[in-house]
Amino acid sequence: MAASSLSLSSPLSNPLRRFTLHHLHLSKKPLSSSSLFLCSAAKMNDHIHRVPALTEEEIDSVAIKTFERYALPSSSSVKRKGKGVTILWFRNDLRVLDNDALYKAWSSSDTILPVYCLDPRLFHTTHFFNFPKTGALRGGFLMECLVDLRKNLMKRGLNLLIRSGKPEEILPSLAKDFGARTVFAHKETCSEEVDVERLVNQGLKRVGNSTKLELIWGSTMYHKDDLPFDVFDLPDVYTQFRKSVEAKCSIRSSTRIPLSLGPTPSVDDWGDVPTLEKLGVEPQEVTRGMRFVGGESAGVGRVFEYFWKKDLLKVYKETRNGMLGPDYSTKFSPWLAFGCISPRFIYEEVQRYEKERVANNSTYWVLFELIWRDYFRFLSIKCGNSLFHLGGPRNVQGKWSQDQKLFESWRDAKTGYPLIDANMKELSTTGFMSNRGRQIVCSFLVRDMGLDWRMGAEWFETCLLDYDPCSNYGNWTYGAGVGNDPREDRYFSIPKQAQNYDPEGEYVAFWLQQLRRLPKEKRHWPGRLMYMDTVVPLKHGNGPMAGGSKSGGGFRGSHSGRRSRHNGP
C-alpha cells in the first residue's frame, strides 16, 4: 500500500487519472464528496484512460521544455574534472532530471557508460507465498521506462547499455573491460537491494585497481544527511517526524544536469529493451480504466498536466480521497516508484505553482504526502527486516490465517462485497488502486478475513505499478496494526466507506458492470440473487446503515489523506 504513491507508495502503486475538476465551478467552499464523485462518474466511460492524457507530441514538447528549465546553465562555471570512464548503474532512478548519481558520474570523468541490468531475480517469486515478484503490468511499465530513458540519454550524447543478468556479475566485468575505476549508483534501503550492493562492491574489489562502488543518496525530498536526528532514532510517530523536519530541515535544490553529457565509450552492442515474453512474462493489456505510460517524459508530462494544464493542484486536498476517474489525485506514484521523476522536482514545481497561481492547503498537502514517502523510506532503514516479519517492527503476536481459498476470493474479486471486489478488479486490470481503496481492502483482509497481512502485501508487490518495498510494507504493517506506531489499529467499515466515498455506487458499477442496472441504493448491497454470497461476515456492521468501530483514518494514522502504499500523492 504505501509505496508511493502522491503516497506519493505501489505494488502498487499509485496513480490513476480520474475526473476533470477544471469543469467544476470552483468556489471557496470545499467541494462535497458526493458532487466530486458524480462529476467523476460523468467523465468515466468504458474507454481506457491514458495517463497522462497527452499526445506523444505533447509529451515530447513538455519534456523538452522541462529539461531546459531544469538544466545546468551553459554559462555555469561547473566543469568536468575527472578522466577516464565511469559506469553509471541505473536502478530505481530511471531519469535524467535531478539525478545526483548521473551528475557525479559526469563531473568526475570524461566518459560515462550508463548501464541497466535486467536482474532475473526481479522476475522470480515473492519470499513467503511465491507470487510473481513483478507482474505483467509493472513489467511492461518498466520496459517503457527503459525505452524512454535511452531516448533521453541519447538526446544528451549518451546511450543506455542494457544487459540481462545479475549486477554483481555484469558490473565488475564491464569495469574490467572498460578500465572504469568507479561505478556510481543511487543507494537503496531494503535488504534485497542492499545485498546486491554488497555483492557488486565485492565483485568490483576483485577487479583490482581500487575499483569501487560509490553510492549516492537521491530518493527522498529531505536528504538523509540533513535530518535533525540519526535515522536509527527516527520517531515512531509520523507527525513527530513531519513537524521536526519541517521546522529544522531545508529541502535541497534539485541537481541541474547539463544538456550535453557525452561522450560514451565505444560499445559494439548496446542491447535491446526486451519483450516481456523474452523475460518469461505473459504480457497483459489494460482493457478498462487507467493505462499509465511509462518513462520520465510521461512522468514529467503528468506533472504538467495535473498542475498546469488542468490546474488541479489547487483542489487536491478536497479530491484526493476519490476512487473513480483519472484526476481525483496526482497519480505521480508509478513514476516516483521507478524514479522517473524525483520528489524534489515535484517540490520545485509546487513552489512554482504557488508563486504563479495559488498557495493553499491543497498545494501543501502534496508535500505532506511526499513527506510520508520519505518517512517510510527512512523507516525501512531503522526497522530493517522486521518490516517484512509477521509481527512487524513491534513483534506483535496475533492469530493469523493463511487460508488459501479465502485469500483467492480476495485476490480474484469474489468476496461478495462490491466495494472490495471493485477495488481488487481495478488492481488486477490496471495495476493501480486508489489510496482509499488500498486502506479498505487491507482492513478487510486483515480484520474481517483474519488473513496473514503478508499475503496482501505480496500480492500488491505483484500487481502495483507503483510498488516499492518501503512504502508497500510500511503501509501494510500499519494497516495490520503491527507497524512502528502502536496507535495504528484502525478498522474500515465497508458500509461507512461505501456511504462516504461511493454514495451513488458509480465506482462499483464501473468495475462490476452487472451492478449498473440496479438502483443506486442497491449497488453496494445487491444480495446473493443479484451478485454472490459474501465469504465472511463483517466484524462491524453488515448493512447499508451500519457504522464502524474506529473507522475512518488512513493507514498512516488520523490523516485520511494518507496514501496506502503509494509512492506519492
Curated annotation (Swiss-Prot):
Q: How does it assemble?
A: Homodimer.
Q: What else is known?
A: 5,10-methenyltetrahydrofolate (MTHF) acts as a functional antenna for the photoreduction of FAD.
Gene Ontology process terms (BP) = photoreactive repair
- Per UniProt, where does ATP bind? R436, D485
Per its record, how is this protein called by name?
Cryptochrome DASH, chloroplastic/mitochondrial
Q: Which keywords are on file for this protein? A: ATP-binding, Chloroplast, Chromophore, DNA-binding, FAD, Flavoprotein, Mitochondrion, Nucleotide-binding, Photoreceptor protein, Plastid, Receptor, Sensory transduction, Transit peptide
In residue numbers, the region (Disordered) covers 541-569
Q: Which Pfam families match?
A: DNA_photolyase, FAD_binding_7
Taxonomy, superkingdom: Eukaryota
Origin species, per record, is Arabidopsis thaliana
Q: What is the effect of changing E193A?
A: Loss of binding of the MTHF cofactor
Please explain the role this protein plays, according to its UniProt record. Answer: May have a photoreceptor function. Binds ss- and ds-DNA in a sequence non-specific manner. Has a photolyase activity specific for cyclobutane pyrimidine dimers in ssDNA.
